[in-house]
Design a protein with these regions (language model features):
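N-terminal Rossmann-like FAD-binding beta1-loop-alpha1 element of flavoenzymes
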Residues: 3-31
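Conserved Rossmann-like nucleotide-cofactor binding loop
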Residues: 13, 37, 272
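Glycine-rich FAD pyrophosphate-binding loop
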Residues: 22-47
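Mid-domain catalytic core of redox enzymes
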Residues: 24, 241-250, 254-359, 373-377
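Conserved flavin/dinucleotide-binding core of flavoenzymes
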Residues: 44, 325-414
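Dinucleotide-binding Rossmann-like beta1-alpha1 core, especially the glycine-rich loop
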Residues: 48-138
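General small-molecule cofactor/ligand-binding pocket signal
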Residues: 81-83, 235-239, 352-354, 384
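Active-site/ligand-binding neighborhood in enzyme catalytic cores
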Residues: 128, 132-250, 268
């Protein structure tokens, strides 16, 4: 079997790239997906009568009009609802005036530092004092270690109460294995702006991603990817994974023995999930340095008394790090689902749970150099990494689609 473009993975990256080629009149491609259905981390299943997104919480951010217009070709805009994000943090804090040391549960909107005004004044005062003393506000040099950097950036109290425990739950037990290079985009937490926010009783600063988002009216987020997969007809192979890539001859061998020769191989799958034949030892060693986490998505059938779309839980006394309140964005549904790093997950009898072996690429200290080396080697062999796993970067689906569209524009002229 031969194709000019052999596309590995039928998630948002692979599906977008393939459909862009098709839309340009290029039909010399084939897509390989190991699962029986396409969508990758954005797949949905019907659970308790309604869709559940089995790869976590995925929504279509409105900020990239070109991406939205592209996806609306497969699932028209009138089939989506548009929401203003309501995300919150549930945190247990000891009231400063308490003599017992017992914690009390508080809820505030995300991001934490922009919504301190929602807490009691005694808590506001504590956080304001901590922010004023933060290293980034006092000319102290930027620390090298992750935990020290978080404290330097946000102040010791936000770090201790929220950022450090939450990131520990979501990413790694030893946070100092993570680098700090990916945190530089976070704005400084200004004492003056935080104080003014508390006085005016409103959030300050720019809002996080998905401030406004689309979600299907009648389906899960996986529906749009299913429709994109259907457009590919016999150019899509499902239900069989990739065993190896012959980097010298650009031959992909599938687990069932099928061999596909390509002029270009577009890989959207994790690098450590496939054998790279003819790759030198230093490349294989670099791949071993690319780390990731697994998650378990578990459905809970009870309705919660909240308007939030999702809620973050930094408390180390519970396994999961966030919940997605399905009933607030999926019309006619009930309940919610939890997202838990698999290392922390403790299955209970009767759990309805889905495990994603590859959920989040980790921004470890060694990652930038390692992935750069892998991608450089691969590209010289006409193997191109694309998307969350091909580039080993924590891209949301809209970013992945955007990158796939741009790559297709570039490759169409090759």
């Amino acid at each position: 079997m031969k194709a000019k473009y052999v596309i590995l993975g039928g998630g948002p990256a692979g599906l977008t790239f393939a459909n862009c080629l098709k839309n340009k009149g290029i039909n010399d491609y084939i897509v390989v997906e190991k699962e029986s259905t396409v969508g990758g981390l954005c797949r949905s299943e019907i659970v308790d009568g309604s869709p559940l997104d089995i790869g976590g919480g995925h929504f279509l951010d409105v900020r990239r009009p070109r991406v939205c217009e592209f996806l609306f070709k497969y699932m028209p805009e009138e089939e989506w609802d548009r929401y203003s994000r309501d995300s919150r943090i549930s945190v247990d804090l000891v009231p400063p005036e308490s003599s017992s040391g017992k914690t009390k549960k508080y809820e505030l909107h995300h991001p934490f530092e922009a919504n301190i005004w929602e807490l009691p004044k005694s808590q506001q005062k504590r956080y304001l004092e901590s922010i004023a003393a933060a290293g980034c506000n006092n000319g102290e040099p930027k620390p090298a270690k992750f935990v020290d950097w978080i404290t330097w950036k946000l102040g010791k109290d936000i770090a201790k109460d929220y950022m450090i425990p939450y990131n520990t739950k979501m990413f790694a037990s030893n946070l100092n294995e993570l680098g700090t290079y990916w945190l530089d985009k976070l704005p400084n937490v200004s004492y003056e702006e935080t104080l003014e926010s508390c006085k005016q009783k409103k959030a300050y600063g720019s809002q996080p991603g998905h401030t406004e988002f689309y979600y299907p009216k009648k389906f899960g987020y996986g529906e749009v990817w299913l429709r994109m997969g259907a457009e590919l007809s016999d150019k899509l192979i499902t239900g069989v994974g990739v065993k190896s890539i012959d980097c010298m001859n650009r031959i992909v061998t599938l687990l069932d023995g099928t061999k596909i020769e390509g002029e270009y191989i577009i890989s959207t799958i994790p690098w450590d999930s496939v054998e790279l034949e003819w790759a030198p030892t230093k490349i294989k060693d670099s791949i071993k340095k690319l780390k990731s986490t697994s998650i378990n998505i578990t459905y809970i059938g009870e309705n919660l008394n909240t308007d939030a779309h999702w809620i973050y839980y930094p408390g180390l006394d519970i396994d999961y790090h966030r919940i997605l309140v399905r009933s607030n964005f999926c019309p006619g549904s009930k309940g919610y689902w939890t997202e838990t790093r698999s290392e922390r997950y403790h299955e209970k009898e009767g759990d309805i749970t889905f495990k994603m072996d590859y959920a989040y690429p980790l921004n470890t200290i060694q990652k930038p150099e390692a992935i750069a080396r892998v991608l450089d080697f691969a590209q010289k062999s006409h193997i191109i990494g694309l998307g969350r796993w091909g580039e080993h970067n924590h891209y949301n689906s809209d970013v992945t689609v955007d990158r796939a569209m741009k790559l297709a524009d570039k490759m169409a002229g090759v």
